């Protein structure tokens, strides 16, 4: 006897899913390029990008083809074996970056967990078992595991789960003097996002990152760049460290790496990687053929002059629209970020209302993000069309007008 199929609605979420999210009332069902449609057929311009994930838009033909081809070849074998798509992708990443070794995981959290474990272990086996201090920054975000959420340091994410990993120090972002005050030879790593995404789309200053590099060298500590959100072309360079001219010891990547397919990577040097051995870390799904095939196709498109050199012009188009909205409605105190990771900070009279602007945007037919309660965030496709930018920002202007009561 056939099981009766009931309608899938937003109410279904509340009935079956753990209450760790508060999703929108509409359910997207189809995407193409920078447009999305919901169950009722309503169209949205997507400037959220799945939180900086769909770097080539939705259902890009090259990614679809890679998925279909690999899906008919080999899905999963575990890391008891290696596979061709993983080795090809690893070679591409190494040839394009400072790195000499890479390991694949499934999410930004897992890549960062790997990085932090490696940093601690490297210090332990190469220097001292007492060299365990990790220095991180206020308003950081590095993931949701107990280790990564502790390095992130935001109490709203880390409190209420019992004892946390210890010897993690947090200091103000972009404050080199604060780092110097806590840095010593017991420090194993400094962990930093070149652009704080969840923390308000705040970019590090060149002097800050250069100073961190010098301090790490002075104290034999590793410099870890979390480029989960700002990497893979988002800034206009393949990775943000290239823009700054500051090379980390370890770099993490995820989100746009797979163009929408779950995959992450941790990149490092051969010498640092040699601290690990078989069994030091692992993942059942990490580096699976499906994910690596799609990521390889995404990499081949993103790492081209056509894409990377077009990002600044697209950014300026967004900024022009935001400035026009601000001139008309007087809502933003700052427009910041880098490349196509854009933050618009709300003026004091609208502090705490970022979600109101987000919801009004969805009602007007445009998907945007917030970065905390006071900042609107835009993380669109790196190949978003000018017409989509113009249409989406016009819709966002209508949303702003509604919130401010104009």
Curated annotation (Swiss-Prot):
Provide the protein's localization: Cytoplasm
The annotated pathway is:
Amino-acid biosynthesis; L-arginine biosynthesis; N(2)-acetyl-L-ornithine from L-glutamate: step 4/4; Amino-acid biosynthesis; L-lysine biosynthesis via DAP pathway; LL-2,6-diaminopimelate from (S)-tetrahydrodipicolinate (succinylase route): step 2/3
EC numbers on record: 2.6.1.11, 2.6.1.17
Q: Which CDD domains match?
A: OAT_like
Keywords tagged on the record: Amino-acid biosynthesis, Aminotransferase, Arginine biosynthesis, Cytoplasm, Lysine biosynthesis, Pyridoxal phosphate, Transferase
Residues where pyridoxal 5'-phosphate binds:
108-109, 141, 226-229, 284
Coarse class of the primary localization is cytoplasm
Q: Which GO terms describe its molecular function?
A: identical protein binding; N2-acetyl-L-ornithine:2-oxoglutarate 5-aminotransferase activity; pyridoxal phosphate binding; succinyldiaminopimelate transaminase activity
What InterPro entries does its record include?
Ac/SucOrn_transaminase_bac (IPR017652), AcOrn/SuccOrn_fam (IPR004636), Aminotrans_3 (IPR005814), Aminotrans_3_PPA_site (IPR049704), Class-III_PLP-dep_AT (IPR050103), PyrdxlP-dep_Trfase (IPR015424), PyrdxlP-dep_Trfase_major (IPR015421), PyrdxlP-dep_Trfase_small (IPR015422)
List N6-(pyridoxal phosphate)lysine occurrences by residue.
Answer: 255
The record lists N(2)-acetyl-L-ornithine as bound by 144, 283
Q: Name one GO biological process term.
A: lysine biosynthetic process via diaminopimelate
One matching Pfam family is Aminotran_3
Cellular component per GO, a single term: cytoplasm
Required co-factors: pyridoxal 5'-phosphate
Cofactor binding note: Binds 1 pyridoxal phosphate per subunit.
On the tree of life, the source organism's domain of life is Bacteria
Question: Which top EC class is named for this enzyme in its record?
Answer: transferase
Q: Catalytic activity, per the record?
A: N(2)-acetyl-L-ornithine + 2-oxoglutarate = N-acetyl-L-glutamate 5-semialdehyde + L-glutamate; N-succinyl-(2S,6S)-2,6-diaminopimelate + 2-oxoglutarate = (S)-2-succinylamino-6-oxoheptanedioate + L-glutamate
Task performed by this protein: Involved in both the arginine and lysine biosynthetic pathways.
* Miscellaneous notes: The reaction catalyzed by ACOAT is highly reversible. This enzyme may also transaminate ornithine.
According to the record's subunit comment, the protein's assembly and interactions are: Homodimer.
Provide the family line. Answer: Belongs to the class-III pyridoxal-phosphate-dependent aminotransferase family. ArgD subfamily.
Q: Which NCBIfam families match?
A: arg_catab_astC (TIGR03246), argD (TIGR00707), PRK01278.1 (NF002325), PRK05093.1 (NF003468), PRK12381.1 (NF009047)
What is the name listed in the Swiss-Prot or TrEMBL entry for this protein?
A: Acetylornithine/succinyldiaminopimelate aminotransferase
Give the lineage: Bacteria, Pseudomonadati, Pseudomonadota, Gammaproteobacteria, Enterobacterales
């Amino acid at each position: 006897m056939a099981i009766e199929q009931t309608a899938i609605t937003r109410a279904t979420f509340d009935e079956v899913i753990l209450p760790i999210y508060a999703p929108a009332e509409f359910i997207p069902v189809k995407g193409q390029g920078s447009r999305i449609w919901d169950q009722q057929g309503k169209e949205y311009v997507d400037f959220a990008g799945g939180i900086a994930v769909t770097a080539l838009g939705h259902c890009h033909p090259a990614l679809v083809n890679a998925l279909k081809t690999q899906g008919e070849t080999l899905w999963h074998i575990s890391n008891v074996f290696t596979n061709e798509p993983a080795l090809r992708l690893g070679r591409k990443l190494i040839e394009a970056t400072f790195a000499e070794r890479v390991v694949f995981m499934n999410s930004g959290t897992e890549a960062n967990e790997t990085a932090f474990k490696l940093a601690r272990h490297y210090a332990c086996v190469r220097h001292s078992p007492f060299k365990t201090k990790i220095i991180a920054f206020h308003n950081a975000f590095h993931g949701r595991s107990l280790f990564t959420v502790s390095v992130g340091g935001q109490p709203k994410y880390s409190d209420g789960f019992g004892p946390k990993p210890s010897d993690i120090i947090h200091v103000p972002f972009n404050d080199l003097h604060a780092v110097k005050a806590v840095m010593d030879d017991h420090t194993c790593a400094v962990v930093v996002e070149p652009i704080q995404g969840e923390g308000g789309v705040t970019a590090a200053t060149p002097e800050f990152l250069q100073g961190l590099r010098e301090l790490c060298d002075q104290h034999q500590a590793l410099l870890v760049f979390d480029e989960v959100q700002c990497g893979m072309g988002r800034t206009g360079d393949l990775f943000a460290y290239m823009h700054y001219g500051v090379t980390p010891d370890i770099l993490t990547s995820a989100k746009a790496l797979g163009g929408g397919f779950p995959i992450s990577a941790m990149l490092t040097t051969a010498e640092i990687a040699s601290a690990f051995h078989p069994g030091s870390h692992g993942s059942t799904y990490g580096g699976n053929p499906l994910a690596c095939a799609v990521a390889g196709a995404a990499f081949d498109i993103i790492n081209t002059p056509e894409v990377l050199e077009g990002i600044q012009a697209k950014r300026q188009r967004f900024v022009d629209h935001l400035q026009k909205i601000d001139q008309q409605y007087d809502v933003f105190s700052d427009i910041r970020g880098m490349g196509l990771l854009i933050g618009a900070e709300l003026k004091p009279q609208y502090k705490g209302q970022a979600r109101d602007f987000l919801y009004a945007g969805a009602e007007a037919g445009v998907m945007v993000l917030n970065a905390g309660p006071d900042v609107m965030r835009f993380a669109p496709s790196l190949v978003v069309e000018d017409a989509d930018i113009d249409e989406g920002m016009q819709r966002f202007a209508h949303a702003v007008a509604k919130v401010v009561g104009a």
